[in-house]
Amino acid sequence: MKILSVRAVALPALLLPLVSAAPTAIAAEQTMVVTAAPSAVSELDTPAAVSVVNGDEMRQAAPRVNLSESLGAVPGLQVQNRQNYAQDLQLSIRGFGSRSTYGVRGLRIYVDGIPATMPDGQGQTSNIDIGSLDSLEVLRGPFSALYGNSSGGLINATSQTGAQPPTLEASSYYGSFGTWHYGMKATGAVGDGTHAGDVDYVVSTNRFTTHGSRDHSGARKNLANAKLGVRINDVSKLTLLFNSERQLSEQDDLSVMMYAGERETTQYQSIPRAPQLKPTHAGGVIDLTRHYQGIDTRWTHRGELLVPVTFTTGLDYETMSERRKGYENFVMNNGAPQYGEKGDLRRNERNLMWNLDPYLQTQWQLTEKLSLDAGVRYSSVWFDSNDYYITPGNGDDSGEASYHKWLPAGSLKYAVTDAWNVYVSAGRGFETPTINELSYRSGDQGGLNFGLQPSTNETVEIGSKARIGNGLLTAALFQTDTDNEIVVDASSGGRTSYKNAGKTRRQGMELGLDQQFGESWRLKAAWTWLDATYRTNVCDDASCKGNRIPGIARNMGYASFGYQPEKGWYAGSDIRYLSDIMANDENTAKAPSWTVVGLTTGYKWSYGKMDMDLFGRVDNLFDRRYAGSVIVNESNGRYYEPAPGRNYGIGLNLAWRFE
């Protein structure tokens, strides 16, 4: 059982406006703008591996509960639903994040500019409201390192902006395993957004409940998202999350963004009484409260220095304070343990983590066809722990650590034609242990794992992007060498300890296609080959050099084809493939490969000012039995988390326009 509450607010004064580049010679409605890249340009012109997923497409005939429903077409992204809503999705980009047993690790996540990743690198996707999402961008490769610590990849979610006419929407979905999801959303605007006093707004609320496909996997979640924008004058806009945009001049922009939040978690773990009685055991109940805040200031200048150039320099500061307690997950009743009750205190500590990162990014238009993007970030992370639970057999485990690293990245892009770009990029990444990874030492030892060191990686990538008719074809080859890779040491009874694994290598290839035929037919396809191996031995009893890194599929494939008119009947199908996944370092256990098929159909119509959408779907059409995810290096051999069999769902969406 887990109880989680999250509160966050951003308090910016001035937010950097998007720096638009010249569009390519294609229809505007076919251009997806990337804001997670070094500057806001089209997906075709971005000198990095990036994918943009439209929010309307993510909501099409979908439950709107998990990102795993709609991200299969993103190359290099392995997203698996654990069917365990206490642990969030298992999400990795090019193998980064695959070891996480809780939340999202090794990646940076932003929601409307607010980090959904804590300063220590631990993130979550459960706070992303699919119902009000405008777009979601996935940035892979060297440039993600410019976002600082734990940037093996970047996920940038952007909420919708209200527009005229005002609209009220209601959505509902019912599916197998007692699954319900329903929500309300109001959007609108006063004015056209270009004059002082103009206002836009989006307010979204929804509720999700399920009995779960496995025993004891029921869950419920309430989620709300609100966004309010106010045009202050012709060059300033205030967005209440809160974000504000101000252009100092035609050449200069200044941005200051502040945010703060709180997260509270209480989790009861199924651990027998005997292990909890050891003097160094932290108990079976985790009780923690986190307060986090940050500020990001940046200045952008556009001008000429022999050639057109854009400079962005800034300073990013983040801090987090955590109060972590542990209790026995039982009380004695008539001489017998009664589980599920908070017992005696077994852990009490206060952890502080903060980082301070200056950074510089530049863009040079060297010739009409050749451009250079380069940047550097100096990442400094400090960690301090104060132990307040000191007893005989459990000494003072207080300690501190600090980590520092230069993170350069660069990319050279050449426009072969107006519709075909090629690029080469390289960069260095840096990943410190999270507080969760420091929380436990191997062998039931007490105290924090200060022997765990940060990992560093170097990546090179070459890529190609081509506009083919009304479609986009992308390809990328990459290699990442990592030193001091952080991997799972042991996992048992809800406790996971970590260790450094020496050297690893990830090399692979990604292909992606998004092709539209005529006005209503759409084909999406993605394929990823990823060879992730240990280059040094990480096993105690045998040599693991050359073994595959567990938790990472070597091959992933996805294809979907659908008929999607604006009104009337629509239908689609998708097929997903995942090759086998090793479950331990020794490569003696693995989850077999699987292929599943899904179908959707629905009907859209309008009556006066009302738009309606009635749909149905079936997932895992052929009732394939497979492991949806694995728990890496689970000490008792319980590696596999089963996925649901064939399951069904129906939904109805209504929207009323106040015209």
Show the residue positions of the predicted features.
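Face-selective signature of the C-terminal outer-membrane beta-barrel domain
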Residues: 237-239, 243, 248-390, 415, ...
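Gram-negative outer-membrane beta-barrel transporters
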Residues: 298-305, 365-372, 477-481, 499-584, ...
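Surface-exposed extracellular loop regions of Gram-negative outer-membrane beta-barrel proteins
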Residues: 319-328, 334, 382-389, 400, ...
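Conserved C-terminal beta-signal and adjacent last beta-strands/turns
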Residues: 187, 229-231, 243, 424, ...
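Transmembrane beta-barrel wall of Gram-negative outer-membrane proteins
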Residues: 174-209, 213-251, 363, 375-377, ...
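Short acidic/polar hinge/loop motifs at secondary-structure boundaries
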Residues: 106-107, 114-140
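A beta-strand signature from Gram-negative outer-membrane beta-barrel systems
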Residues: 128-171, 181
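Membrane-embedded beta-barrel scaffold of Gram-negative outer-membrane proteins
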Residues: 194, 253-271, 415, 421-427, ...
